[in-house]
Design a protein with these regions (language model features):
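Terminal targeting signals and extreme-terminal segments of soluble enzymes
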Residues: 1-122
Length: 122
């Protein structure tokens, strides 16, 4: 990819990822080193309590972080990840996952992320 990143390019990357496409996310913003996407709240993504399952949230941010890192033109794969669940993602239309590259690199890229609900909380 070039320095000019489009939503369409990032959406195409997302849809080419067989696992990532299962999440049915929609890229809403994209620029070099930063991607924002909406993850729909679907019954199939919930845990026994009706909240979004933590594994689904982790998978969503892992996928979006990979796309954000990939905007620099490198093939990427996750080597390490950490997430802290501060609040349950309760029934809402969608949650927003925002990934921002903190330190780009050819061999290792560091990406931070944030998850919010439709009200900007979580």
């Amino acid at each position: 990819m070039q320095n000019k990143i489009t939503i369409e390019e990032c959406q195409k990357l997302l849809e080419q990822n067989p696992f990532g496409s299962l999440l049915q996310m929609k890229i809403t913003e994209a620029e070099l080193g930063r991607v924002k996407a909406e993850l729909p709240f679907k019954k199939e993504f919930t845990n026994i309590y009706g909240d979004l399952h933590g594994g689904v949230l982790y998978s969503a941010v892992d996928t979006i972080c990979g796309i954000a890192a990939g905007t620099y033109g490198y093939y990427v794969t996750t080597v390490d990840g950490q997430i802290r669940y501060l609040k349950a993602a309760r029934a809402t239309e969608y949650v927003t996952c925002t990934a921002k590259v903190v330190k780009p690199g050819r061999n290792l890229t560091v990406v931070a992320f944030e998850i919010t609900d439709a009200n900007g909380m979580l």
